[in-house]
Amino acid sequence: MAKVADKPFFPKPFLSFLVLSIIFGFGITLSEAGFPKIKHYKWDVEYMFWSPDCVENIVMGINGEFPGPTIRANAGDIVVVELTNKLHTEGVVIHWHGILQRGTPWADGTASISQCAINPGETFTYRFVVDKAGTYFYHGHLGMQRSAGLYGSLIVDPPEGRSEPFHYDEEINLLLSDWWHQSVHKQEVGLSSKPMRWIGEPQSILINGKGQFDCSIAAKYNQGLKQCELSGKEKCAPFILHVQPKKTYRIRIASTTALASLNFAIGNHELLVVEADGNYVQPFVTSDIDIYSGESYSVLITTDQNPLENYWVSIGVRARLPKTPPGLTLLNYLPNSASKLPISPPPETPHWEDFDRSKNFTFRIFAAMGSPKPPVRYNRRLFLLNTQNRINGFMKWAINNVSLALPPTPYLAAMKMRLNTAFNQNPPPETFPLNYDINNPPPNPETTTGNGVYKFNMGETVDVILQNANMLNPNMSEIHPWHLHGHDFWVLGYGEGKFYAPEDEKKLNLKNPPLRNTVVIFPYGWTAIRFVADNPGVWAFHCHIEPHLHMGMGVVFAEGVHMVGMIPPKALACGSTALVKNYPRLP
């Protein structure tokens, strides 16, 4: 098993909010100022015919690639992406998942929150600093475009001359996703219909955009399966992990799934978990990991098994009915042929409903030595109840009985320009009734839509208690992974049932809670997080399951908007902001 260095390393933020505003506002290049490099990309987003799982379909790609191109930079670098929308009939934005966007909240890539959607034929330029090493990704954030295939990897290395607190010889990058044969537009219409038409389970699991439908590369172990006949040159041919014996590999794993929670395992190999969501964790050994939509991990493996054999890599579905075959590929010990199948069948995915196993993995994640510690006390605490509801017969998801419906004018611009009629100025409820029974369906399933904002004072320490509950049908509660834009947060703890402060306060971990940007709520349970509202902007906080967000499962946070500097004009060209003349672009 790989060794991990004792010395922690945590890169400091590269630029302050003010310096970023000055640089971007006045067009000073970083090379002129003596700062780190600029990574410049020109992307065209368009629909393409593709065969992700050996069945031809339409995907949303970038520059003719699916998944999109990988961005690779060092912490402190500036990333510039000129994004041209070639979709013809719909807008587009891209969210840089896990990037904090300090000083550039307009570049967060959230339609109706940080910017206007980019119209067909138009180009929008994203500029932002990647300020912290880690494993990240990017994806569409308008409608359900992530489910259509608009995603790619974003890898940030330490600043030049710095090293990570662990050693490895080489690395492999894996982007996991789920795939449907039904178009995203049909899915969206079905979710918005009365009665609601559910999207169903995915047809395939993709590994770096590659999967197999209606056949298996492991059919020889199961006579009921059809063997895939592949030459290796097809778009759906497995992405093989080629390795040399007696080396240590860092495998970066990110999940951009629209629905599925996944389990990752490699036959005969242990995994040493060292990073989660761009933050170092106390290393621990496990046979497999559960990874929820929006999460990322780095694991180290040592190729110390029989070098004459190859080994299975298996990605199975967890927390949902097992109707989707596992995604499979090979850990290919060179110089063995990649066509040589392992002697044993693929690792078996744990039972889909074994939440105790999921919790045992999640509860082992702690911050690495030297990580920032949370403030001891909070200034404000929100209790967010997650329920399934209806509005006039339409099925919705709601938080504290409000289903999020985004306004046509982006919050960031509306608040900066003080357009008080652009959205509801009354904030949503900060808690829910103490006597609410989370173990039964809502007594009053009717809910309302809303677009109010939770506003925080700059520097305020905020606790959020995410509370899960029963759905509309009895005895049903689902896992929900929640992602916060613009911040990392400390995961203080998890619990069963309804959060009860006098008792559950004692369970919160203030010593070494992990920093994350995505966290799971287990069925009928609660999750407590803490963050500091120190990043001027407007930020989404939402379930990372695409259909759930589409149906209203999210809220919006705002802090320090008066401190936000220049907002590019193209981010303002919609809704009420498009009518404002002579808006001062600089503070």
Swiss-Prot record:
Residues where Cu cation 3 binds: 141, 485, 542
Catalyzed reactions per annotation: 4 L-ascorbate + O2 = 4 monodehydro-L-ascorbate radical + 2 H2O
Bridged cysteine pairs (disulfide): 54-236, 116-574, 215-228
One of the record's GO molecular function terms: L-ascorbate oxidase activity
Predominant subcellular localization, coarse grouping: secreted
Pfam families listed in its UniProt record: Cu-oxidase, Cu-oxidase_2, Cu-oxidase_3
Residues binding Cu cation 2, per UniProt: 97, 139, 544
EC number: 1.10.3.3
Cofactor(s) needed: Cu cation
Annotated keywords: Copper, Disulfide bond, Glycoprotein, Metal-binding, Oxidoreductase, Repeat, Secreted, Signal
Sequence positions that bind Cu cation 4: 480, 543, 548, 553
GO annotation, cellular component aspect: extracellular region
Cleavable signal peptide: 1-33
Enzyme class per UniProt: oxidoreductase
Protein localization: Secreted
Family indicated by similarity: Belongs to the multicopper oxidase family.
Its biological purpose: May be involved in a redox system involving ascorbic acid.
Protein name: L-ascorbate oxidase
Lineage of producing organism: Eukaryota, Viridiplantae, Streptophyta, Embryophyta, Tracheophyta
